[in-house]
């Protein structure tokens, strides 16, 4: 029996991080966690990491699609924060972002790691951006690194 699992070191990988500016005080912490993990765990060089900033979470899938279509990257990490408010806007934004990023991955055969927080409060978002619930940006980077190595097994 053959078991394929991806390691975390991917020093030659080209990684794109697409990040929303909306809720930037949280997203910048996610970005710091992702970059730290890519460099320290994945051994990815600065020159192999590209950061693309977009206005909000709704724009993440479109830009991720363009990044994927460029064929220059081995994985994409999407980072953002969507916080529930008093209107149904949260469901629309979170749902379309999730669906769109998943579609990019399937359409372009590239790992798209979902590091978009969807929380009920600012406090929950802060907890997931490097305080008591860990850093979801770092976790998204770990997923991207592992998937780069898994996908390489099928080339």
UniProtKB/Swiss-Prot annotation:
SUPFAM superfamilies attached to this UniProt entry: Lumazine synthase
Domain of life: Bacteria
Active site: 89
Positions bound to (2S)-2-hydroxy-3-oxobutyl phosphate: 86-87, 128
Keyword Protein biosynthesis: no
Reactions it catalyzes: (2S)-2-hydroxy-3-oxobutyl phosphate + 5-amino-6-(D-ribitylamino)uracil = 6,7-dimethyl-8-(1-D-ribityl)lumazine + phosphate + 2 H2O + H(+)
Pathway(s) of this molecule: Cofactor biosynthesis; riboflavin biosynthesis; riboflavin from 2-hydroxy-3-oxobutyl phosphate and 5-amino-6-(D-ribitylamino)uracil: step 1/2
Any one Gene Ontology cellular component term annotated for this protein: riboflavin synthase complex
Residues involved in 5-amino-6-(D-ribitylamino)uracil binding: 22, 57-59, 81-83, 114
Alphabetically ordered keywords of this record: Riboflavin biosynthesis, Transferase
EC nos: 2.5.1.78
Enzyme class: transferase
The family this protein is said to belong to: Belongs to the DMRL synthase family.
Listed PANTHER family: 6,7-DIMETHYL-8-RIBITYLLUMAZINE SYNTHASE (PTHR21058:SF0), 6,7-DIMETHYL-8-RIBITYLLUMAZINE SYNTHASE DMRL SYNTHASE LUMAZINE SYNTHASE (PTHR21058)
Function: Catalyzes the formation of 6,7-dimethyl-8-ribityllumazine by condensation of 5-amino-6-(D-ribitylamino)uracil with 3,4-dihydroxy-2-butanone 4-phosphate. This is the penultimate step in the biosynthesis of riboflavin.
NCBIfam families assigned: lumazine-synth, PRK00061.1-4
UniProt protein name: 6,7-dimethyl-8-ribityllumazine synthase
Organism annotation: Psychromonas ingrahamii (strain DSM 17664 / CCUG 51855 / 37)
Taxonomic lineage of the native organism: Bacteria, Pseudomonadati, Pseudomonadota, Gammaproteobacteria, Alteromonadales
